C-alpha cells in the first residue's frame, strides 16, 4: 500500500515544538498545493490541531519517503534549528491508516475520548476535498474513519463521563440536583475556567443565572458573550448568598472569597435548604471550614479530580473494544486497496476468457443456425462468469497463498483439498541436487 503518514503530536514532542510546526488553514492549503503541483504526491491530507500536525501522503515519486516528508514540512515552516526528524512519528501503508483511525476515534488524543477531534479531522478532509488533493485512497480512508468514530460514540462508552474540571463540576451538580434547570446559580469569576463552567451549566437550560466578579466590567463582558446572565456586584454577594442553590467559584488570588460565617448566615435565611458550592479555584476560593456547615455540600478541585480519574479509567476500559472495531475496518480497507491493484489483472483475465470464447464460437458459426449460435453464446457467457466468479472474489480478498503455485491455483478455483496419494511418504533428498551429481 503506497501510503505514508508523518507528523508531530503530544507523544513525540513538547508543546513548544508542536507550536513551531503547527499550520494555520492558509499554511495547510499552501502545503497541499505545493505537494500536488510539484508532482511529489498524488494525494495529500493535512491535519493540524493544538496537539498535532500530521501529513498523510500518497507519494508520486520513489524519492518521497517518510524522511523526505519530515524534512519538507520542517523546511516549509522554516524551523530547521528547532525541529528535527526525531520529533516526528512515521507510519506506512496499513499502519498509516490505523493511526488515522486511532486519531479519528480519539484513542490517540491527549484527553482520551475527546469529542472535538472528529470535527477537526472532518475540517481537514473538507479542506483537502476543496483543494482537490484527495483521491480514492485517502477518500476511502477518511470515510472509513468517520464511520468508525460514529460507531465508537454509539457502541462504546469512550466519550462518556466528564474529564475536565468544568464539566466534572456540572456532572457532580447533576448527581446532587436531578433538575439543574430549576436552580438559582451564582458564578463567581469571569476567567476561562468560569466561562467553561458557565457554558456547561447553560447547556442544561439553566434559567436563573448570576455572574459576579472583582471587576464588574469583566462580568458584563462574560454575560454578553454567553448571551445570558444577570450581574451581581461583588460587594452584595455575601448578603445575597442565601438566594442561590448552586455557587461556582473560579477566581484568582490567595484570599478566601467565601468564608464560614457568610455561609452560616445564608443557611439560616434558607431555612437549612441545601446549597452546593463548587470551588474551582487554585488556590481555593472558599474556606475549607464552610464544609462543616450543615446541609452545605462543598467540593473542590481534588473532589472533581476523583470524578475525572474514575471516568478516565472507565474510558480506558473501552479501548480494546475500539481497537477491535478498528482492526475489522483495517482488514476491509486493506482488501479494498488490494482489489485496486488486482483490478487490471481481473479485467485482462475476463477479456482473455471472452476472447477464447469468441474464437471458438467463430469456428462453428457457419455450421449452426442463428438461434443455436445465440444459445451457445449465452451458455458460454454463463459458464465463463461461473468459472471466473470464485477466482475474482479470491483475488479481491487476497486469501490465496501466492508462495505455493499449486495451493494458489487450488485456492482461487475453490478446489477440494487433495488427498495424499502416498500418505506419510516424504522425499528428504532434493531431486534437483541429486541429478546434478
Swiss-Prot record:
Coiled coil: none annotated. GO terms for molecular function: glutamyl-tRNA reductase activity; NADP binding. NADP(+) binds at residues 189-194. CDD domains: NAD_bind_Glutamyl_tRNA_reduct. Pathway: Porphyrin-containing compound metabolism; protoporphyrin-IX biosynthesis; 5-aminolevulinate from L-glutamyl-tRNA(Glu): step 1/2; Porphyrin-containing compound metabolism; chlorophyll biosynthesis. Substrate binds at residues 49-52, 109, 114-116, 120. InterPro entries: 4pyrrol_synth_GluRdtase (IPR000343), 4pyrrol_synth_GluRdtase_dimer (IPR015896), 4pyrrol_synth_GluRdtase_N (IPR015895), GluRdtase_CS (IPR018214), GluRdtase_dimer_dom_sf (IPR036453), GluRdtase_N_sf (IPR036343), NAD(P)-bd_dom_sf (IPR036291), Shikm_DH/Glu-tRNA_Rdtase (IPR006151). The keyword DNA-binding does not apply. Its EC number is 1.2.1.70. The active site is at residue 50. The record marks 99 as: Important for activity. Disulfide bonds: none annotated. Catalyzes the NADPH-dependent reduction of glutamyl-tRNA(Glu) to glutamate 1-semialdehyde (GSA). During catalysis, the active site Cys acts as a nucleophile attacking the alpha-carbonyl group of tRNA-bound glutamate with the formation of a thioester intermediate between enzyme and glutamate, and the concomitant release of tRNA(Glu). The thioester intermediate is finally reduced by direct hydride transfer from NADPH, to form the product GSA. Belongs to the glutamyl-tRNA reductase family. Homodimer. Possesses an unusual extended V-shaped dimeric structure with each monomer consisting of three distinct domains arranged along a curved 'spinal' alpha-helix. The N-terminal catalytic domain specifically recognizes the glutamate moiety of the substrate. The second domain is the NADPH-binding domain, and the third C-terminal domain is responsible for dimerization. This is Glutamyl-tRNA reductase.
Amino acid at each position: 500500500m503506497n501510503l505514508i503518514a508523518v507528523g508531530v503530536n503530544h507523544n513525540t514532542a513538547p508543546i513548544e515544538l508542536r507550536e513551531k510546526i503547527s499550520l494555520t488553514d492558509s499554511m495547510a492549503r499552501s502545503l497541499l498545493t505545493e505537494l500536488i503541483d510539484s508532482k511529489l504526491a498524488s494525494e495529500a491530507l493535512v491535519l493540524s490541531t493544538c496537539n498535532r500536525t500530521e501529513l498523510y501522503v500518497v507519494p508520486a515519486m520513489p524519492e518521497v519517503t517518510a524522511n523526505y516528508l519530515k524534512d519538507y514540512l520542517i523546511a516549509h515552516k522554516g524551523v530547521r534549528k528547532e525541529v528535527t526528524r526525531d520529533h516526528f512519528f512515521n507510519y506506512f501503508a496499513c499502519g498509516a491508516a490505523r493511526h488515522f483511525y486511532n486519531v479519528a476515534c480519539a484513542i490517540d488524543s491527549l484527553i482520551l475520548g475527546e469529542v472535538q477531534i472528529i470535527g477537526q479531522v472532518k475540517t481537514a478532509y473538507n479542506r483537502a476535498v476543496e483543494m482537490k488533493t484527495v483521491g480514492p485512497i485517502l477518500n476511502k480512508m477518511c470515510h472509513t474513519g468517520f464511520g468508525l468514530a460514529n460507531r465508537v460514540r454509539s457502541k462504546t462508552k469512550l466519550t462518556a463521563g466528564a474529564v475536565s474540571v468544568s464539566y466534572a463540576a456540572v456532572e457532580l451538580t447533576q448527581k446532587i440536583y436531578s433538575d439543574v434547570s430549576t436552580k438559582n446559580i451564582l458564578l463567581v469569576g469571569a476567567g476561562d475556567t468560569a466561562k467553561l463552567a458557565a457554558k456547561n451549566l447553560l447547556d442544561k437550560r439553566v434559567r436563573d443565572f448570576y455572574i459576579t466578579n472583582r471587576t464588574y466590567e469583566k462580568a458584563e463582558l462574560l454575560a454578553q458573550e454567553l448571551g445570558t446572565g444577570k450581574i451581581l456586584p461583588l460587594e452584595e454577594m455575601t448578603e445575597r448568598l442565601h438566594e442561590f442553590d448552586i455557587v461556582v467559584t473560579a477566581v484568582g488570588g490567595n484570599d478566601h472569597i467565601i468564608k464560614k460565617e457568610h455561609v452560616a448566615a445564608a443557611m439560616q435565611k434558607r431555612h437549612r435548604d441545601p446549597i452546593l458550592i463548587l470551588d474551582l479555584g487554585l488556590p481555593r476560593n472558599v474556606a475549607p471550614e464552610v464544609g462543616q456547615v450543615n446541609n452545605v455540600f462543598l467540593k473542590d478541585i481534588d473532589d472533581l479530580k476523583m470524578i475525572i480519574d474514575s471516568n478516565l479509567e472507565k474510558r480506558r476500559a473501552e479501548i480494546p473494544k475500539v481497537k477491535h472495531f478498528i482492526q475489522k475496518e483495517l482488514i476491509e480497507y486493506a482488501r479494498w486497496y488490494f482489489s485496486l491493484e488486482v483490478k487490471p489483472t481481473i479485467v485482462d483475465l475476463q477479456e482473455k476468457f471472452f476472447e477464447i470464447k469468441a474464437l471458438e464460437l467463430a469456428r462453428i458459426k457457419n455450421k449452426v443456425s442463428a438461434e443455436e449460435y445465440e444459445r451457445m453464446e449465452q451458455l458460454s457467457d454463463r459458464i465463463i462468469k461461473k468459472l471466473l466468479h470464485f477466482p475474482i472474489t479470491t483475488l479481491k480478498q487476497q486469501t490465496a497463498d501466492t508462495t505455493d503455485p499449486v495451493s494458489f491455483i487450488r485456492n482461487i478455483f475453490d478446489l477440494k483439498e487433495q488427498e495424499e496419494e502416498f500418505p506419510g511418504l516424504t522425499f528428504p533428498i532434493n531431486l534437483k541436487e541429486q541429478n546434478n551429481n
